[in-house]
Amino acid sequence: MARYLGPKLKLSRREGTDLFLKSGVRAIDSKCKLETPPGRHGARKTRLSEYGVQLREKQKVRRIYGVLEKQFRNYYKDAARQKGNTGENLLTLLETRLDNVVYRMGFGATRAESRQLVSHKSILVNGSVVNIPSFKVSASDVISIREKSKKQARISASLEVASQREKPTWVEVDNTKMEGAFKRLPERSDLSAEINEQLIVELCSK
């Protein structure tokens, strides 16, 4: 399945919440009505079935992290094989994707932009170029911007935007050096309360 290239705000309206697909320079609610689904008949309220609610939650999380359906299924299988809570394991796996860590550190304004930085070989992991967005980052790994990429205006702009929002506690970033450390795996309490991972587990375990 191809990656979605259409309007980002349309996806946020579809899920009824900010999926953080835009840079955050301007509040998303000033751009569109999140409570109204996209389309000609978006204002019509439809009651979702139990399956529909579960599916929407899965789609929401998949779109937040920018992964394709097959990738998401593989992440779920890995999460189910691990000890502990499957839903929390799933979120942890998604959070350790390199493109997501680059975003969390503020080097990219969005996860999509962060994925592009990785793909274009602008990112180093422990001093070596890694151009695989799904690369799994481990605790204590050091993520940095490649020297020849440090002059990119979009990276400086992203760091400026990131400085205005609350920094994740599981990463530590030196904006001057354009370098950050992935200190630890995030705990469930660190992540968005708007995600109900149990709905995803109920859907995928059927």
Swiss-Prot record:
SUPFAM superfamilies: Alpha-L RNA-binding motif
GO molecular function, one term: rRNA binding
S4 RNA-binding domain ranges (all copies): 96-159
SMART domains the record matches: Ribosomal_S4, S4
Entry annotated with the keyword Cell cycle: no
Keywords: Ribonucleoprotein, Ribosomal protein, RNA-binding, rRNA-binding
InterPro entries per record: Ribosomal_uS4, Ribosomal_uS4_bac-type, Ribosomal_uS4_CS, Ribosomal_uS4_N, S4_RNA-bd, S4_RNA-bd_sf
GO biological process: ribosomal small subunit biogenesis; translation
Cellular component terms (Gene Ontology): small ribosomal subunit
Family: Belongs to the universal ribosomal protein uS4 family.
Assembly information from the UniProt record: Part of the 30S ribosomal subunit. Contacts protein S5. The interaction surface between S4 and S5 is involved in control of translational fidelity.
UniProt function note: One of the primary rRNA binding proteins, it binds directly to 16S rRNA where it nucleates assembly of the body of the 30S subunit.
Name of the protein this chain belongs to: Small ribosomal subunit protein uS4
Record organism: Shewanella violacea
